[in-house]
Amino acid sequence: MLLIAKYVIPVTSPYIEDGAVLVRDDKILDLGPASQLKDKYPEEEIRDFGLSVLMPGFVDVHTHLGYTALRGMFGDLPYAEWKRQVLHTEPFFTEEDWLDSARIGALEAVASGITTIADISASGVSRIPASEMGLRARVYYEVLTAQKEHAADAVRAGVEKIEQWKDECGSDLLDFGLAPGPVYGCHPSVFQAIADVAIERGIPVAMHLAGSQEEADFIRYGSSPFGVHVSEHEQGKLASAYPPWLPAGTSPVSYVSNWGILDVPGILAIHCVQVDDRDIGILREKDVHIGYCPRINAKLGMGSAPLEKFWTAGLTIGLGTDSPAAVDTTDMIDEMRIGLMITRATSSERFVRASAKNALRMATIGSARALGIEDKVGSLEPGKQADIIAIDLHNSHQNPTTDPESAVIYTANQDNVKMTMVAGRILYDDFVHVSGCDRDAIVDRARALRVRIREEVSDEALRRSLIEHASEDKQDRYNR
């Protein structure tokens, strides 16, 4: 099939006006000016997308699709309180609820032009809708324990779980890895145990790192905004007032580096907001890959990752949408635009590398490199997998444009994605899902889930409030 559009953006080479991409089976065979490829391949079926951009699909290096149903429930909260509210809600979810939530997230990812996701959870639920809908995915199993004596068993169980998922999935589009739980909720021996097994077996590893001031203070001083009284469900996921080990007196990056996990080849460190120049030096020395998630960092007041410094240090950087429970959408175009603008507003070298071209690279080939799959995806090149999207520019305020990369970043959004192809298979075409999934049923189930969860969370919040007030009244009577 010959895909034709006004602009073809290979990402790793200059864009082609009036360009074409030849796809056969699951691979890209050729690309170039449309007139030349039509003459060269006269028997090929032609799909002409007109005033559109053809480009590699977005590679989302960090998401939590299982939380999609929670979006809009906890708005305008700082990170620590948002985290607590989300964790309070988790017990209300059944296994089927998590699946319904992940399905609506995967459905929207496809419609947003995302062709590869990297998802972290303890359930691995995202692997199911990814497989159902034809997405490329890496699913990390989250290993979480605050108890040193449980660390080895927890990591061993994680390895067994991802081996089980591999056996069950039966798809070349899915692979699996390990992810330690939050630095503030995980015993450090977990980091060492994961590093040992990952290096030995070549298992991909990702971790949240230096994402908030709360995390930085907890590691350095042992302080925590979450308080002493945490529920059984929250144990391990939230830090109590004092860690079960001595405060490290150093930064999160230095702390985890001392426990060996940054020695895992190609480890993906997500966020890296609370970092200084020494930390960046460690990240560079260890060749740590960065997962940049500007929207959630800004919305939850976590800070802003020093993107320009990462670029200057030569770090590999990919882009992630993170939790839909915070950012509401899986819009990688919005993620690029906001990240670019935040960097220009906060960096002393505003326009050295913070360009539309580099933002587009970060969301495609940069993200592919961050996951170690740049040999397969991330750019339009002969021999690579045919993970391709078409973005409609008819409504672009830059139309007619002399810079299609700028038009995508500054005037498009996820609603302008008109076609999504993964491994040569079209999943979304002319703004309609064609992968065989029942879109209406998925949406209806997600809506019903949101209504039920909202009601149950509201009832639980009222119950907790009554208990807290009763406790305060009892204390007042005692004081009198």
Model-predicted regions and their roles:
Residues 1-19, 24-29, 40, 209, ...:
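Active-site microenvironment of metallo-dependent hydrolases
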Residues 36-55:
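Active-site metal-binding motif and surrounding structural segment of the metallo-beta-lactamase
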Residues 53, 71-135, 156-170, 447-451, ...:
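Alpha-helical scaffold segments that flank or form the walls of functional sites
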Residues 69-100, 138-144, 213-264, 338-354:
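Active-site gating loops and adjacent loop-to-helix segments of metal-dependent hydrolytic enzymes
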Residues 64, 122-123, 142-146, 179-183, ...:
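Active-site beta-loop-alpha junctions enriched in small/polar residues
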Residues 228, 258-262, 308-395, 411-412:
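His/Asp/Glu-enriched, well-ordered alpha-helical/loop segment
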Residues 128-129, 155-289, 301-317, 375:
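Histidine/acidic residue-rich metal-binding segments in metalloenzymes
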Residues 57-68, 204-213:
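Histidine-centered catalytic micro-motifs
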